[in-house]
Amino acid sequence: MKDAQRVLHIRCGDDIKGKLAEAGLAGDYLSFADPAWLGPPPAFNAWLAGRAALIADRSGLPQPKVRAELGEAYWRLARAPADYRHIVLWFEHDLYDQAALVRVLANFAQRTGLPRVELISIDRFRGIKRFIGLGQLTAQQLASLWPKRKRISRRQLALGTRAWAALRALTPEPLEALLASDMRALPFLKAALKRHLQELPWTTDGLSLTERETLAALARGPLTVSELFAETQMKRDPLPFMGDLFFWSVVRDLIEAPRPPVAVSAGTRRSAWHRRMLRLTPTGRALLGGKLDWQMQQPLARWVGGIPAGPGAPDWRWNPRSRHATQLK
């Protein structure tokens, strides 16, 4: 039975849960934190276990905990239209949020008789010079967004469905087709998906944008993982979307590759991961100098949404000149 009184707030994380209560925005809270930009999507019959294993591997969190939380989140998402008369989605402009948003919209698009579903989505806030996300805001600032919520339209549901299918595709071609279409129904989605494609190897050096920013930051001198995260995600990245755990998984792949461009200083190898001191290797300097292509150095296999990257995969690249994905022959 639908609860006529309570609101369900949906967000990709717990960062504003307490603040909403403090602001007097009563209701239940669903943390739908599945990183929808992270692939590949496993077959349906192995979906939950496969998804939990992938997220646990990339985040370093215990797999049983991830599986339990993921299962509950998807169960609650499936039940939400039947259990509530009012649902409010809180998603900012970055890739993590926009990918989660289209996943939620694709889910709701399959339902009939939706309740009132509204969206609060921003890319800036007065007084904050570099707006990263809703988690930066105080309870009072979050409360000021409440009157600006807008009801989800059929166009948004349709665009979310198409975007979710494109994110899961094995090639970037559906994403490119989507980016060439009218995406004004979700005004922050286009930039977020462009940023997603920039995680493909680049035509210039075979590095993703995050990998290149990592090497460039270390070229100035050794940094701890925490310092490196702050430098790349808080300062360098034009549209940051990774939390520290997922950023560490990118760095870890660079460290563990056969010809690593990044190394851990010997004295900190047993330290907690965020305190380990990192330095650039000769391979890293050669990559930054344009003397090597990272895809020719046996990097560890990875996924960009549904697109495989690395040894043996079709060589899809991001071309920074054309600002489109292209396949090298």
Regions found by a protein language model. Name each.
Residues R212, Q233-G267, G284, K291, ...:
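Charge-enriched amphipathic alpha-helical scaffolds
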Residues L119-S144:
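Short, conserved secondary-structure transition motifs
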Residues A217-E227:
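Short capping segments at the starts of secondary-structure elements
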Residues W273-T326:
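Short, amphipathic alpha-helical interaction segments positioned at domain boundaries
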Residues A139-A219:
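A conserved mid-domain beta-alpha-beta active-site/ligand-binding segment of alpha/beta enzyme cores
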Residues G60-Q110:
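Long, hydrophobic/aromatic-enriched structural stretches that serve as scaffold segments
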Residues E227-Q233:
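A short acidic, leucine-rich amphipathic alpha-helix
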Residues M1-K65:
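A structured, charge-rich N-terminal accessory region that forms the first stable segment of a protein
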